[in-house]
Amino acid sequence: MEETYAPRCSMPAELHHPYSKFSDWKFKLFRVRSMERAPLPGEMQLERGALSGVVASAPLGETVGDVVGLPGSVMKLWLGGKSKENVEGPGKRVDLKLQEMDTYMNHLRCLCRLCGGALRKAKGPEHEVQGLLDEASMSALRRVGCKATSWPEVILKVFKVDVAGDMEVVHPPFFCQRCWTLAMRGGGFCSFSRTHVPGWRPHTTLCLLCTPRNPHYRGERKRRKPTRGAQHLAKRTKWDLQDNAAIVGEKRAWRTVIDPPQGPGLRPWVRSSVQRAQWVKSITLCQKEHLSARLLSEDLPVDFLSSVTCQVCDHLLSEPVQSPCRHLFCRSCIAKYIYSLGPHCPACTLPCGPADLTAPAKGFLGVLHSLPLLCPRESCGEQVRLDSFRAHCLGHHLEEVDGDHKSAENSLDNFLPVNKGGRPRQHLLSLTRRAQKHRLRDLKTQVKVFAEKEEGGDTKSVCLTLFLLALRAGNEHRQADELEAMMQGRGFGLHPAVCLAIRVNTFLSCSQYHKMYRTVKATSGRQIFQPLHTLRTAEKELLPGYHPFEWQPALKSVSTSCHVGIIDGLSGWIASVDDSPADTVTRRFRYDVALVSALKDLEEDIMEGLRERGLEDSACTSGFSVMIKESCDGMGDVSEKHGGGPPVPEKPVRFSFTIMSVSIQAEGEDEAITIFREPKPNSEMSCKPLSLMFVDESDHETLTGVLGPVVAERNAMKHSRLILSVGGLSRSFRFHFRGTGYDEKMVREMEGLEASGSTYICTLCDSTRAEASQNMTLHSVTRSHDENLERYELWRTNPHSESAEELRDRVKGVSAKPFMETQPTLDALHCDIGNATEFYKIFQDEIGEVYHKANPSREQRRSWRAALDKQLRKKMKLKPVMRMNGNYARKLMTREAVEAVCELVCSEERQEALRELMGLYIQMKPVWRSTCPAKECPDELCRYSFNSQRFAELLSTVFKYRYDGKITNYLHKTLAHVPEIVERDGSIGAWASEGNESGNKLFRRFRKMNARQSKTFELEDVLKHHWLYTSKYLQKFMEAHKDSAKALQATIDTVGSQETQEDADMSLDVPDF
């Protein structure tokens, strides 16, 4: 028998191992019906009248088999691809056993092969049991010495289960993420936890998967509900409505062909001939390969016919084999049947395996081969023996082919479009892509051969040149010029990275960009902007999780996987038994993966810095040090009236970082050489988001749990070196973290100190409020993270058995365990806001002459405040605000503002005191606000101690009514600690939290832009968009295409509504304003 070019003819003569060619089998398993309906070359020959194998073409009234159309695969049927063609057989009689197997297979696909649990309950992707190891898993296992390349090898070593012989009808094809985790933790050799692997058995009538047992179930009182995992039959299509009458008549006819049940619990079954027709359609697929018994020229007895026909397909026997129960089958049909439905005889259901099949007696074979068949060709009508029937039909086919060639040479019809009738021939451009490929198949082959021979295989250039010549010949010169420009690399379209930069910097959501892309393409006729899928491809290289890297030594308690994107903020938190689930929604990047992406974003700047310093590129592969500024701040309530999700408080907390500098310790140099320094350390463009969480910053327990994994990753990175490819060479980096971008409230939260109203006023020294008011300038920085930890242990254990007040005085205000190390410094932005708040209150008191009055009433204070607001609005154009913000503070702390206030102060002496106080403050302010005070304001730095001493004298004398025994937190830090911090760190302003506060404003805008119903997806969108917004790579494209961005913003309304004043101003909460 010749080999037929069709996927279903690949079944071997004997039953082979079920997974001998797993990839080929899997391809056949997931065939789409449109693929199966496609006319293959072998089938096209059959349509023209030729037989491949032992099949001959039939006249109009006859068919060679029960050919109704190309049927589907039985495995497709079992895997849920059910349709009217493959569920219902001839006469639409349903094969109940195949439906039952379909349900059973659906249950198996929902379970884990190794633990038996439901796949939907295990968070994470599912993995193929017979698949190959992915790159991440293989690299992780290679590091621990496992050289396995496929999952069956790993499963055999870890779970002691051989899955190489699994069958699709018995074993689940997937295993869950939990079992994957166990395999990875065991290094591919062993399992550290006991996993009971269930023993999978074939499907039976009383299968526990299809009909699970329930001990509380009473069958006689309540009807059992269908199982949850079972799939329902497909809905009836509109084609089924035409045969309603036939279906009703068929149901009535079934009663005549079904044998009555033999017992009270037995179900009736369909007649054997109908069952065989269904097997042909769904299992054997031999309609065009085996001969029908209707080709017999004589009217033979029924018993004789049953002896020469196959008990599976009802066709004449082809390569007959005999079972132990003396039933006869075609060799290929019984092999497919046993593989699909199990090793038993189709006729009597007795056990029958592939090894039990034998060849029938020679006498029977002689009778079978001598059967007379009638040739189905109309012009022939001869009676041909069965053994010579194939040669006879092949001769007819060769004659027809020769005749076609002669007629084609003698006529001009060969040059006309081929149309065999039916629908009129459509134009090439109106066809589907698949039909276009089919029509141009020969031309494509010729062009490919020419390109390989003449142009080195560049088929694209050949096709574009042909198109260009066709346009020139048709005088389409404008379109030809555009095509030629595109071929030369100077096309009209923008680069995908440019389009991504425009989308991010103009705050366009994906849907808004897609509408703009379609509008521009439709109106201009050119594809200036790139489609969304190209932008998503460009995004992948810029987001964390794209670049490979390595830590030496490996980070403790951190996964070695490099390709990790946005994860749950609580992942990595080791929960104890007593912990309750966190009432929060949080999303973050893994800290080390985010740092790698940020460094790759600075790759060009780092290489340029090496060249500017005259350092040899290949020699600088180690000794890199990276300084990181960390910032964290709560944003207050940003809740809206719409949106779904868990009822968590909508008080976001943002944790971000900024790469401040990159330096290298070159060989032979005493000091490190700085090759990159962030030019705008307080810009929102350089402050990269790491974590977003909906949590109240006052909730110490939840905040500790959310930031705990970040702290663990941060501490692990301090003791390891990062190996990363920069500039084509692997280089090692060490990271130094400085937590400086925190306000007073957040510092006290992280360091375990009492709240801002505590007696212990300062987070830098141990002074009380009374001590700080008596001695305003002579203090030094004494607190540290390690000291706070030691004091917490004293507070927790009380080793000296002291009273509460004595113990509190000993630990200096430490009341909780510090969980994140912060740098003992002063935040410049919040210092400005806190001092401006204090000056605002001084102005009120001076207007009301509080130095004369003991206890003014609340109404009097309100009137003074109203007068001050009115004067500032009139003279300074300053609108009153509910809470002090950065913009208001900058305008209030000026000489113009104090002059406006002096107009409301009656005493000349008090006016001069106010002017002197503001003048001293204006001279002191640049020292803590400038990025590098030694270079930018050296004179103010030298006079700072004198000015602060004079400032303190004014407060303790002229304004003694307000500062007698008390002083604010930020005024104390301003007067006492600024010179020491500047001498130690070189700057205060560069390490401020202003970039993170500006990012809070961006958060509100991104949230409006990406308003999805789920808070989880909303945080992911905001985090991803904000990261892209801070990309140096995209900022360079934005600088080069400013005009494109301005034109886009002028033509498209990106937000749809004006920004509120709350978003326009940087709103920062300060208590008691």
Curated annotation (Swiss-Prot):
- A Pfam family matched by this chain, by name? RAG1_imp_bd
What residues bind Zn(2+) 1, as annotated?
C286, H290, C313, H315
Record's GO cellular component, any one? nucleus
Residues in the DNA-binding region are: 421-488
List the PROSITE patterns: NBD, ZF_RAG1, ZF_RING_1, ZF_RING_2
Q: Any idea which UniProt keywords this protein has?
A: Chromatin regulator, DNA recombination, DNA-binding, Endonuclease, Hydrolase, Metal-binding, Multifunctional enzyme, Nuclease, Nucleus, Transferase, Ubl conjugation pathway, Zinc, Zinc-finger
Quote the record's binding site residues for a divalent metal cation.
D633, D743, E997
Q: Give positions of the RING-type zinc fingers.
A: 310-349
Zinc finger regions typed RAG1-type: which residues?
A: 371-400
As to how many cofactors bind and how, the note says: Binds 1 divalent metal cation per subunit. Mg(2+) or Mn(2+).
What is the required cofactor set for this protein? Mg(2+); Mn(2+)
Its Enzyme Commission number(s) read: 3.1.-.-, 2.3.2.27
Q: Where can this protein be found?
A: Nucleus
Q: Can you state which reaction this protein catalyses?
A: S-ubiquitinyl-[E2 ubiquitin-conjugating enzyme]-L-cysteine + [acceptor protein]-L-lysine = [E2 ubiquitin-conjugating enzyme]-L-cysteine + N(6)-ubiquitinyl-[acceptor protein]-L-lysine
Q: What GO annotations for molecular function exist for this entry?
A: double-stranded DNA endonuclease activity; endonuclease activity; histone binding; metal ion binding; protein homodimerization activity; sequence-specific DNA binding; ubiquitin protein ligase activity; ubiquitin-protein transferase activity
Q: What is known of its domains?
A: The RING-type zinc finger mediates the E3 ubiquitin-protein ligase activity.
Q: Which family does it belong to?
A: Belongs to the RAG1 family.
Entry function:
Catalytic component of the RAG complex, a multiprotein complex that mediates the DNA cleavage phase during V(D)J recombination. V(D)J recombination assembles a diverse repertoire of immunoglobulin and T-cell receptor genes in developing B and T lymphocytes through rearrangement of different V (variable), in some cases D (diversity), and J (joining) gene segments. In the RAG complex, RAG1 mediates the DNA-binding to the conserved recombination signal sequences (RSS) and catalyzes the DNA cleavage activities by introducing a double-strand break between the RSS and the adjacent coding segment.
Name this polypeptide is given = V(D)J recombination-activating protein 1
What is the protein's species of origin?
Oncorhynchus mykiss (Rainbow trout)
